[in-house]
């Protein structure tokens, strides 16, 4: 209405201005005509009249010019005002049109979810289902695992710092279109020179052990021109001649029993069988109890039912263990402090990195491995001496007697390695994500202690390359993962987890901030039974991925079906045997380990760290068509994609805390028994139990339920005008993911475990006395084992604080 009134007022003023202009412009012309007519009429004028007339004319002209300038200014102002008014109207019109268009779009535009928006804004239009389908199809249509296994095995010398396997891995990544990054480290490591064992009778050599496997028919790996004798990485150089004693598995309990039975074990060569505990701890225990050196052999008795004693033929004619089998190993104490023993707690990043003395992290006595066949004549001479120890033995004519040997029966042992600083290289491929945090890391080592290594190193490396190939197909379809993904080929793992430990120590701050999960491939294919060790947080995503993975190409039989049929889909505890050690126990990054391994009752016996771990053995007794490799590549890749492609971290905190709660209940009863009259200990233990119970039965359930609701919100399609709801969901999403990533890190302690400061995870660690199994609540357990009241109180206080922080985090 006001605009109409202003318009009318403007038109009225405009009309008045025009009238004035017409009048003023007409007067000069009329006066001029009148003056001309008078002059013509009179016919003549006087000079005075002319002068007067000129003066009047000048005055009139000046007056008319002043009027003309004023009128021009008014007209100009009017035009400017008119132009301004037109622009204002135009802007109003534009604004109104824009609002109308936005309203139309808001009313009729397709609904979108927060999940889809993440991808649209980053030009990634593949849905989760399409991502899974493309990845699985790429691996189902082609399986290159056999090619990779043979390529790696063909180099026949894939130890630490091997250049051939490094170059092959690097070239494969480059051919797929990746830009791999090479990280070099410089650890202190040994190169085997010679090992020798010879039994002596009255000072004379009875025979010299071969210290190497037989050349067998049909297996090219055993006929390689360059073959390495059995050795122990990080064993002490030296030669020893002494009497010997059989010490069963070499555990602390075995040695306590030997001392209880008054067996003389001082300054003897201790012969122990492999199994039960890590080789390094066997040598460590032997050194502690006065051994001069150690021999470790593999007893077929520990192979279960598949033995020659039970009628099975040995390899290559049957599934039983070949009697000439020798297991090479590392004997550094990596269940205490993994990695380079001369750079504990920091990476050997440069060639001039300071290296400390390895004392306390490696043995100070020599040790060597032997075959069952070579050790048999030595053990046989112990019969009737000492007492019988252990569960039994399949060493021919040996009754498991401890000895020691007679004064005329001795063994000469020689061990020699050359120790130097060597360059090692890990190869890393990064796939950037839409999010900058929440990395999923997949790792596999390519080194081994024996040539070939088809089941151990080469299978894991082949599967890693197949996963990379499947993801390269996705990248060609314009895929960009929500979370970043890394694939890493480790070096030096079999020597003592060198590559992964150096990497974790070098990138500790970044990994704590960004890493979400570490997935490990080690000894990936050595049998047909699927086995999984994992942090309980990952249970749900592992089960879901297994259900969506076809087992060996069978559409109606999933990996989960096979897993449940063979072992009831059991997820075991992590131990201290592989590359996940640094991630889980040092940094608090949830980890999982996957493998197909042998069945003790019917499966072929696996020849670990031996020349018999060859493609021939693999194809003959385990995986002739390499479909297990294909199944594993699909499963691990699918697990990675499920973690990466979901906006919400796929962690189940209730399952996680329920496991911890059950663990603690077991230790709580032990605490009451160990300190029955100690009110302070029992009161503190009860407070921890009550706090953990509330966190498990209330906080974790509520947190998981809220995450379930949030998951649906992220997938809910909303109109454009409801963008504020997406903003609220996004804020909640960021907060939830941050909490999920922090939960495991809350159990990282600065002090670490007693005498194992590098192990900082208070919920789980490799067993201090076995190493090959995981130990729950290790600080509390070790304090209880030593009946150390101060240590128990310290760990109860730590757990009380940590569980309080968990409750606060989940609320």
Swiss-Prot record:
Principal location: membrane
GO CC annotation terms, alphabetical: endoplasmic reticulum; membrane
GO BP annotation list: protein targeting to vacuole; proteolysis
Keyword Cytoplasm: no
GO MF terms, alphabetically ordered: aminopeptidase activity; carboxypeptidase activity; metal ion binding; metallopeptidase activity
InterPro entries, per the entry: PA_dom_sf, Peptidase_M28, Peptidase_M28B, TFR-like_dimer_dom, TFR-like_dimer_dom_sf
Sugar-bearing residue positions: 55, 237, 568, 599, 670
Cofactor: how and how many bound: Binds 2 Zn(2+) ions per subunit.
Biased composition (Basic and acidic residues): 1-21
One matching Pfam family: TFR_dimer
Membrane-traversing stretches: 90-110
Subcellular location: Membrane
Entry binding sites for Zn(2+) 1: 456, 607
Bias type Low complexity, positions: 336-345
Cofactor(s) demanded: Zn(2+)
Functional note: Involved in vacuolar protein sorting.
Family according to the record: Belongs to the peptidase M28 family. M28B subfamily.
Protein name: Vacuolar protein sorting-associated protein 70
Organism, as annotated: Saccharomyces cerevisiae (strain ATCC 204508 / S288c)
Taxonomy of the source species: Eukaryota, Fungi, Dikarya, Ascomycota, Saccharomycotina
């Amino acid at each position: 209405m006001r605009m109409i009134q202003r318009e009318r007022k403007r038109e009225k003023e405009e009309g008045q201005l025009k009238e004035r202009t017409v009048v003023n412009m007409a007067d000069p012309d009329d006066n001029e005509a009148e003056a001309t007519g008078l002059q013509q009429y009179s016919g003549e004028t006087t000079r005075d009249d002319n002068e007067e007339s000129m003066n009047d004319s000048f005055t009139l002209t000046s007056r008319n010019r002043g009027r003309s300038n004023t009128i021009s200014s008014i007209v100009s102002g009017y035009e400017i005002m008119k132009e301004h008014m037109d622009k204002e109207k135009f802007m109003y019109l534009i604004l109104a049109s824009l609002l109308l268009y936005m309203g139309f779009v808001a009313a009729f535009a397709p609904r979108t979810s927060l999940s889809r928006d993440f991808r649209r804004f980053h030009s990634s239009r593949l849905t989760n289902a399409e991502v899974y389908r493309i990845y699985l199809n790429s691996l189902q249509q082609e399986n290159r695992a056999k090619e990779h296994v043979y390529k790696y095995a063909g180099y026949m010398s894939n130890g630490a710092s091997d250049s051939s396997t490094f170059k092959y891995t690097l070239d494969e990544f480059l051919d797929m279109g990746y830009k791999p990054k090479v990280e070099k480290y410089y650890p202190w490591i040994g190169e085997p020179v010679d090992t020798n064992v010879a039994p002596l009778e009255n000072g004379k050599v009875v025979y010299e052990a071969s210290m190497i496997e037989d050349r067998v028919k049909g297996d090219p790996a055993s006929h390689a021109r360059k073959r390495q004798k059995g050795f122990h990485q990080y064993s002490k150089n030296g030669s020893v001649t002494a009497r010997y004693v059989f010490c069963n598995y070499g555990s602390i309990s075995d040695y306590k029993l030997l001392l209880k039975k008054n067996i003389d074990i001082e300054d003897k060569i201790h012969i122990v069988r492999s199994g039960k505990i890590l080789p390094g701890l066997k040598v460590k225990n032997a050194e502690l109890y006065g051994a001069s050196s150690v021999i470790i052999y593999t007893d077929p008795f520990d192979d279960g039912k598949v033995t020659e004693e039970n009628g099975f033929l040995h390899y290559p004619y049957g599934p039983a263990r070949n009697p000439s089998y020798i297991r090479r190993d590392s004997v550094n104490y990596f269940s205490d402090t993994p990695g380079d023993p001369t750079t504990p707690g920091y990476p050997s990043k440069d060639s001039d990195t300071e290296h400390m003395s390895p004392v306390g992290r490696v043995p100070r006595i020599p040790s060597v491995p032997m075959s069952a066949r070579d050790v048999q004549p030595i053990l046989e001479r112990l019969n009737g001496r000492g007492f019988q120890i252990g569960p039994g033995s399949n060493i021919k004519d040996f009754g498991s007697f401890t000895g020691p040997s007679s004064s005329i029966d001795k063994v000469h042992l020689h061990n020699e390695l050359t120790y130097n600083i060597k360059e090692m290289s890990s190869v890393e491929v990064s796939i950037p994500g839409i999010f900058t945090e929440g990395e999923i890391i997949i790792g596999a080592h390519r080194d081994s202690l024996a040539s070939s290594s088809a089941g151990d190193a080469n299978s894991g490396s082949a599967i890693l390359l197949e996963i990379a190939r499947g993801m390269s197909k996705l990248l060609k379809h314009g895929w960009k993962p929500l979370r970043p993904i890394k694939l890493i080929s480790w070096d030096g793992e079999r020597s003592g987890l060198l590559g992964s430990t150096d990497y974790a120590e070098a990138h500790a701050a970044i990994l704590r901030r960004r890493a979400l999960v570490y997935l490990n491939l080690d000894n990936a294919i050595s049998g047909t039974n699927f086995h999984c060790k994992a942090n309980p947080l990952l249970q749900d995503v592992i089960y879901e991925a297994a259900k969506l993975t076809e087992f060996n190409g069978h559409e109606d039989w999933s990996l989960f079906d096979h897993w449940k049929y063979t072992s009831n889909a059991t997820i075991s505890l992590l131990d201290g045997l592989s590359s996940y050690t640094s991630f889980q126990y040092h940094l608090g990054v949830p980890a999982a380990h996957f493998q197909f391994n042998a069945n003790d009752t019917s499966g072929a016996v696996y020849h670990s760290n031996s020349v018999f771990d060859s493609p021939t053995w693999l194809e003959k007794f385990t995986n002739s068509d390499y479909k297990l490799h294909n199944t594993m590549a699909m499963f691990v890749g699918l697990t990675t994609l499920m973690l990466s492609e979901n906006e919400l971290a796929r962690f189940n905190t209730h399952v996680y805390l329920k496991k911890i709660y059950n663990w603690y209940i077991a230790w709580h009863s032990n605490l009451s028994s160990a300190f029955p009259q100690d009110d302070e200990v029992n009161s503190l233990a009860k407070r921890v139990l009550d706090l953990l119970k509330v966190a498990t039965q209330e906080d974790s359930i509520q947190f998981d339920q809220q995450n379930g609701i949030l998951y649906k919100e992220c997938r809910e399609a909303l109109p454009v005008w409801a963008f504020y709801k997406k903003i609220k969901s996004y804020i909640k999403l960021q907060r939830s993911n941050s909490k999920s990533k922090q939960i495991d890190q809350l159990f990282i302690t600065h002090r670490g475990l007693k005498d194992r400061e590098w192990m900082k995870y208070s919920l789980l660690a490799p067993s201090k006395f076995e190493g090959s199994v995981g130990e729950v609540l290790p600080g509390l357990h070790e304090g209880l084992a030593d009946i150390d009241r101060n240590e128990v109180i310290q760990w109860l206080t730590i757990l009380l604080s940590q569980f309080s922080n968990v409750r606060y985090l989940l609320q």
